[in-house]
Structure formats: C-alpha cells, structure tokens
Amino acid sequence: MSYLFTSESVSEGHPDKVADQISDAILDYFIAYDTNSKVACETLVTSGQIILAGEVKSKVYLDIPEIVREVIEGIGYTKSEYHFESKSSGIISLIHEQSNDISRGIERESPLDQGAGDQGMMFGYATNETANYIPLSLDLSHQLMKELTNIRKYEPELMPYLRPDAKSQVTIRYHDNDIPKSIDTIVISTQHDEFDTAEVMQSKIMKDVRNILIPRIKANYSENIQALFDDKIKYYINPTGKFVIGGPHGDAGLTGRKIIVDTYGGRGAHGGGAFSGKDPSKVDRSAAYAARHIAKNLVAAGVSEEVLVQVSYAIGVTKPINIFVNTYGKSKVKLTDSQIAERVLEIFDLRPKAIENRLKLRNPIYKETAAYGHMGRLPKIVKKVFTPRYANVAKSKDLKKELKVELFTWEKLDYVKKIRKIFQ
C-alpha cells in the first residue's frame, strides 16, 4: 500500500515571514556591531503597522525603524494599494533590556561554561530522499515559492500581476518502502493585481503556473525526481478564485508562526521553539541547528537512511540533559540507536558555546534563514554590508560594516569522514 504525505511553504511576502525577516534583520544588525549582543525580538505586522517587542542586551543602539523599512522594501511592499508599504507604515518599538535574572543564569567566567538560554527540547532530522537531505514534499514547496519570487522580482514581464504574498503545498505519494512514487497534488495560492474578472484571472494564473513556473522547477531536479512530474498531478491554483487582498493587510503576521515550514515540513519532530529574532545563546535556535548538523552528517556518512536527533537543556545549565537518536529501523550499522547516540556525544560538543563556535553562529547570518527554510539550504560565504544611522554606533569611525560571513554552516557535510571512522 502506498501513502500520501504533504508539506507546505510560504513566500517571503507572507505576513508571518515578513515578521520573521524583520526580527532576524534586527538581530543581524545588533550582532554586526556587538557580537555579544543578546537578542529576543518579536514582530507583529498588520495593515499599515509594525509592532516590535522583546528584550536586548547590547552595547549598541540602532535605528530600528530604518532597518524595518529596509526589510519591507526589499520584500516588495512598495505600493500604497497593498495597505502595507515600506515608507508609510507606522512602526512602534517596545523593545527593552534583557532581564538580569536571565543573563546571570547564562554568563560564566569561562565562555565554554555558558549556560543554556532556556529550557526545552530541540530536534534535528535528515533523510536521503533528496540531495539536500530534507523531505521532497518540503523541498518542492520551497522551490515553488523561491522561483515564483524570482519571477516577481527579476522577470516581472513573465507574470506581471504577481504581488508578494504566496503559499505552496505539495503532496507526494510514497511506496511502502518510503521511496517517492509520484507527485499527487500541487497547491499554489499567489496574491495578484486585479486585472480582470475572477474567472479570467484564475485561468490566466493557472496557465502561467503550469507553463512557466512548473517547467522551471522540474528542470532543477535530477532525472528520477523529474520523472515524478507526470500528467496525473492535481493542480489547485488560487482555488478561492481570487487573491488580491493579501500580505499583512489580509492577515496579521507574527514572528515564529511558521516553525514547520522553517524545519522539516511535518517530518521528524519539533520541540516547539521558534528561531527568528533569537541570538545563538537561545538553544531553541542554536541546538536545533546543531541537531540538524548531526542528523545530516549521520545520513550522509551512511549510518542510516533517515535520522532524528533530540537534545534537551535546562536554563543556565551547560551540558544537555539528554541526546536521543531514532533511525526508524533504517540503520546501516550494527549498533542500537542508544549506542549511536553515545558515539554522537563523543564526536559533537553540545555545550551552547561550543555549538556557537563550531557553527560560527556569533555572526550576522540570520536574515537569510528567515524565508524558504532554515534547513536544506546551501552553505556559502557572502559579503554583507551594514550601515547604521545614528546613536552610539554613529559616533564610531567605522560607520559602515562590510563583513564576510558563512551562511547555513549547519548544512555542511564536514563531519562525514570523522563519523565514518568512528562507526566503521
């Protein structure tokens, strides 16, 4: 018996992702000018308004509204008819200083003895069904949204009616052995200009999605994945018939409401903690990245076809409470899952500061994670430029920061040889 599994993604213009990108852009600015900044930034976006709240401990004071407007403009909310626009939307910042009770519990004389920023359990997952070790349903969903955004931003003549907000959903039919058999359903809802009757608009968008978007997505995959794109796929494109009112004007957006889109599309597990707006002292983020790094390297090293890793922490405590490994009965080594977990601890230091150091997390690398998934991305070195506008940063001689940073370090397969040696 085959079975169906579904994952979804959203575009960078989706209200919740707008909020995530604002929170992570603010985090990046703080870390760019003070690498030891402690940040927890939450964002609410709605019609013509952005509200920020959270806690910060930092040596710098930044022009938060200017950073927010820069993000909104970059996404593409630049027209008054969107009722959410970069230049005219109101911004309220309620960010205040981090509690001394929290910082007292985290900071230590020796940096490596730094305690966890909160309690909680975090999960990492990997599967060998795609080249980037994430579920195919999720990868396709992300690629649909990324390519639709690329068309909107860089080739608007192809689909000139596109607006920033969009969602995708892909259902894969699997064989009993968990190998993808076919693509069953593709759902895309994309915001658009009002250019005709509802019926004509839906028909035009459906045609363009199938004739322009889908061939581009298909071309990016290997032959075995391309073979899954057959004429039996069910397409639901803007199934309500019309999607003109969207973005934060259509739905309020909040930081941290797309945690399954951010991770594994419903596969594996999730501890419940969101990522965006949190500096790496928050193990919600850093330990989830570390667990993904472990899981991906285990699968790439051939330990198992599929791996789930759980770690947990207590606030202020340096070492994790536990590590749990599940290979779903697909292990390729003659060890129990508990024995695999023991060997993982021999290889990976899971103290919070050790994770920060290993994955280079004390760098302004976070805005790029805030749309199209934190996992399954391509590690790369980029140059980022930060230009503050005022306050104590503006008194510095180094007004403009140009930094080379490495993105998505937790996606690197840099422990495969070490794992193979220990598990041989």
Curated annotation (Swiss-Prot):
Name the Enzyme Commission number(s) assigned to this protein: 2.5.1.6
Region Flexible loop: start-end pairs: 98-108
- Residues binding K(+) are 42
- Lipid metabolism as a keyword of this entry, yes or no, is no
Q: Where in the cell is it found?
A: Cytoplasm
Instruction: Write down the required cofactor(s).
Output: Mg(2+); K(+)
What does the entry list as the binding residues for ATP?
14, 165-167, 242-243, 251, 257-258, 274, 278
EC primary class: transferase
Q: Domain of life of the organism in this record?
A: Bacteria
InterPro entries cross-referenced by the UniProt entry: ADOMET_SYNTHASE_CS, S-AdoMet_synt_C, S-AdoMet_synt_central, S-AdoMet_synt_N, S-AdoMet_synthetase, S-AdoMet_synthetase_sfam
Pathway assignment reads: Amino-acid biosynthesis; S-adenosyl-L-methionine biosynthesis; S-adenosyl-L-methionine from L-methionine: step 1/1
Q: Name one GO molecular function term.
A: magnesium ion binding
Explain how, and how many, cofactor molecules are bound.
Binds 2 divalent ions per subunit.
GO BP annotations of the record are: one-carbon metabolic process; S-adenosylmethionine biosynthetic process
Binding-site list for Mg(2+): 16
Any one GO cellular component localisation term in the record:
cytoplasm
Q: Which reaction does it catalyse?
A: L-methionine + ATP + H2O = S-adenosyl-L-methionine + phosphate + diphosphate
Q: Where is it mostly found?
A: cytoplasm
**Which key words tag this protein in UniProt?**
ATP-binding, Cytoplasm, Magnesium, Metal-binding, Nucleotide-binding, One-carbon metabolism, Potassium, Transferase
| Stated role | Catalyzes the formation of S-adenosylmethionine (AdoMet) from methionine and ATP. The overall synthetic reaction is composed of two sequential steps, AdoMet formation and the subsequent tripolyphosphate hydrolysis which occurs prior to release of AdoMet from the enzyme.
PANTHER family given for it?
S-ADENOSYLMETHIONINE SYNTHETASE (PTHR11964)
Record's subunit section: Homotetramer; dimer of dimers.
Q: Which NCBIfam families match?
A: metK
Family of this protein: Belongs to the AdoMet synthase family.
- State the name under which the record lists this protein: S-adenosylmethionine synthase
**UniProt organism field:** Azobacteroides pseudotrichonymphae genomovar. CFP2
Tell me what gene encodes this.
metK
